[in-house]
Amino acid sequence: MSDRLLRGLWVLCLIFCITPAVAEALEVSATAAVLMDADMGQVLYEKNGDRQMLIASTTKIMTALVVLEHAAPDDVITVTPNHMAEGSSMYLRAGETVRVEELLYGLLLCSGNDAALALTECAGGLTPFVALMNEKASALGMAHTSFANPNGLDADGHYSTARDMAVLAAAAVENPTFRRICSSRSVTCSPSARVGARRCAS
């Protein structure tokens, strides 16, 4: 899993091991933070928990969750020039075909912005995919969240809060495929006619 995304999940998933007594004594330097008992939904600690902020690559937690609910691992996506993106990448090439599961590894291990865009084809393209992200956020009760893209690049109308992201993390780790991918250190993706074997590593 990418270092940035992993750090984000570790912060969010401290909810599983911090007791209320410890939470009371916490001091954090982050602008905003929430610790939550994932089983009970009880907030143990918060600092600016409802402040709307940029969420960068932690966006990809929602991207993965939406894909896992709307596509099969063996579904195949054809990469197009529209899937190329700035920033972190799994180095996709236009014209190659990639399985959804391999794109999920590229999304969560490499923090691939290109993988995020390619995965929007699971919903028929960027606009309907982002709509699904916002529908899922609403279903989870993420009342102070709005998604504008699947990779977390800064954009108008793209924000969340520490509280909402704690809710999202708790939902994501309930998915066994999400847990399996995020627990991997590396994976080698199958070669295609256009690209040789590709290794994704955290």
What are these regions (language model features)?
Residues 78-89, 155, 188-191:
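Acidic helix-start/capping segments at beta-turn-to-alpha-helix junctions
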